[in-house]
């Protein structure tokens, strides 16, 4: 097969590991900078062009769309889909998961546990918003933030009111969440491919920081997840419509709670922490799906 890896960063560990996994299974891997793609959108033969050449002959793509280019990245993935190319994560699911509020609403609809979350637009609703999530301490998140950036822990009601008011004054979209104190600055990252959790690790934030992101200095360690956590992680990915995703889970006194579903999860941290390859299952899943599509076409023909 010819597999395209949509990534702006060919030198990244994640990109290199995906290339290696494709090649080790006998496939041709092509790294494509998403932002360098341009499209011919028409009703007869839609196409994608790259560095002056039309991109043809691809069986599948693995989107690694950075949050900062979600709109353009999803357009490129959608164009590949229009050309009949299988996408490991499709454009609709990527866009769905990138909208943090929409993602939580989808989880809510499926009855999947999550921290109590509030969303408002008017400053005069702030006191009720704070009470809605159980009061201070609470977590305030920019909807556009990634990798722990734009996440604030407000220890008191006064601090919470000040931060929320400041964000709203800047016309920033924010959500307010209950603070799960018992998680103690840690979470569980589950790496899901299809309907399986292929690897999981516990991430612990640095001393004095409630955020556990490895990019912010957190550390990871192997962890054994419970059957409930495993089932919840897979259900959360399915709720988004994704195939490959990282699911962040908080362990609370009322059971596991989904914090976030990431459509382009980091690979380096979880592979080096667990010693498990998460890239091979991705390629194996693509092989299965592309073969099934070809078989269906043959039957129809």
Curated annotation (Swiss-Prot):
Gene3D superfamilies recorded: 3.40.50.20, ATP-grasp fold, A domain (3.30.1490.20), ATP-grasp fold, B domain (3.30.470.20)
Positions with a binding annotation for ATP: 141, 178-179, 187, 211-213
Gene Ontology biological process terms from the UniProt entry: protein modification process; SOS response; translation
Repeat among keywords: no
Any GO CC annotation of this UniProt entry: cytoplasm
Residues that hold Mg(2+) 2 according to the record: 260, 262
Domain ATP-grasp: 104-287
Residues at which Mn(2+) 1 binds: 248, 260
Record SUPFAM superfamilies: Glutathione synthetase ATP-binding domain-like (SSF56059)
Alphabetical keyword list: ATP-binding, Ligase, Magnesium, Manganese, Metal-binding, Nucleotide-binding, Protein biosynthesis
Binding site for Mn(2+) 2: 260, 262
An example Gene Ontology molecular-function term: ribosomal S6-glutamic acid ligase activity
Cofactor(s) this protein cannot do without: Mg(2+); Mn(2+)
Record Pfam families: RimK (PF08443), Rimk_N (PF18030)
Binding residues annotated for Mg(2+) 1, in chain numbering: 248, 260
Presence of the UniProt keyword 4Fe-4S in the record: no
Enzyme class name: ligase
EC numbers on record: 6.3.2.-
Textual note on the cofactor: Binds 2 magnesium or manganese ions per subunit.
Superkingdom of origin organism: Bacteria
Family: Belongs to the RimK family.
PANTHER family: RIBOSOMAL PROTEIN BS6--L-GLUTAMATE LIGASE, RIBOSOMAL PROTEIN S6 MODIFICATION PROTEIN
NCBIfam families linked to this entry: PRK10446.1, rimK_fam
Protein name: Probable alpha-L-glutamate ligase 1
Biological source species: Shewanella sp. (strain MR-4)
């Amino acid at each position: 097969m010819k597999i395209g890896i949509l990534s702006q960063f060919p030198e990244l560990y994640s990109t290199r590991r995906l290339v290696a996994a494709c090649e080790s299974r006998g496939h041709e891997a092509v790294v494509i900078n998403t932002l360098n793609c341009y499209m011919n959108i028409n009703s007869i033969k839609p196409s994608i062009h790259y560095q002056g050449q039309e991109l043809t002959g691809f069986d599948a793509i693995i989107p690694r769309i950075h949050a900062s280019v979600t709109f353009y990245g999803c357009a490129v993935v959608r164009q590949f889909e229009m050309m009949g190319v299988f996408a490991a994560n499709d454009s609709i699911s990527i866009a769905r998961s990138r909208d943090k509020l929409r993602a939580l609403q989808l989880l809510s609809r499926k009855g999947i546990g999550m921290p109590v979350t509030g969303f408002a637009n008017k400053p005069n609703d702030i006191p009720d918003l704070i009470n809605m999530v159980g009061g201070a301490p609470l977590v305030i998140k920019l909807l556009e933030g990634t990798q722990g950036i734009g996440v604030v822990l407000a220890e008191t009601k006064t601090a919470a009111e000040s931060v929320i008011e400041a964000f709203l004054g800047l016309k920033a979209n924010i959500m307010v969440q209950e603070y799960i104190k018992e998680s103690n600055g840690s979470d569980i990252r589950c790496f899901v491919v299809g309907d399986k959790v292929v690897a999981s690790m516990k991430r612990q934030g640095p001393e004095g920081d409630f955020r556990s992101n490895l990019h912010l200095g957190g550390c990871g360690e192997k962890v054994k997840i419970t059957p409930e956590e495993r089932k919840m992680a897979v259900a959360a990915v399915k709720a988004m419509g994704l195939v490959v995703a990282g699911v962040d889970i908080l362990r609370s006194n009322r059971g596991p709670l989904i914090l976030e579903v990431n459509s382009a999860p980091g690979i380096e941290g979880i592979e080096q922490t667990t010693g498990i390859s998460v890239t091979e299952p991705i390629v194996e899943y693509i092989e299965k799906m592309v073969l099934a599509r070809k078989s269906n076409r043959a039957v129809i023909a």
